[in-house]
């Protein structure tokens, strides 16, 4: 309901502003416009907090709001408007964000963002495309970051065979090492797997990843592979790809996966959903993902938001 209220309120203000432009003009219009913007921001901040919505009083993000389980707000694509965008999320129903490290610098940046914003938490790890930078010293840096009170996962880590480099053997080595780190520090793991279904599963099974727990981010495989991950009690990160017309295999998998094993994600700034495909992505696009899942599941959008938030809090211990 709070998403509907937000949309209605913003559309009302848009029409009202057009009316005032014609009725007034010049400096008087500017003053009225500034007043409306202040009022709008205040009300949009309060709407998601109606009916006991808001912070849980424990500094763990806002409850009963959309939970963004995978974003990269440290990415340079956000350098021009990062603060403005992040400050606007609560007003659009986004309550909690997990910022994911893709390399050592990104992992450290994720921790800094988590320190700066109460609703942001960090995951630290090295993406398979970045493992050439890893070393024993790098693993020690990750281990130290895992001790931060706002780090809730190890990752993203895994295998990506879309490009020939880094070599598969090197990816496998550091994937296994990061799984071992997650087990050591008792944190869930964020898995990246592209065009590497069998090898990813083999390594996870060999290292008993089911005992570690985690999420397969940006899940893109068929429902048969989903069954394997369900057997390990893993969650599934579903993002903008679910809105693509050619995502038939993923849509069948999402219909098969229980709602209590799904997390909402964007992978911002990548993989924007329809109708913004190709543009920079952000958590503001999560309602499109929630709506697509709701349609496939035959439930309300709010039911998806509430279930996925509950799932994410369970996984990340928030």
Feature names for model-found ranges:
Residues 23, 31-34, 42, 57:
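Short hydrophobic alpha-helical segments enriched in small aliphatic residues
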Residues 3, 9, 13, 17-20, ...:
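Short hydrophobic targeting helices and cationic amphipathic motifs
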Residues 28-29, 300:
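The N-terminal extracellular segments of secreted preproproteins, especially immediately downstream
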Residues 39, 44-46, 51-52, 56-318:
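Mid-domain alpha/beta scaffold segments of enzyme catalytic cores
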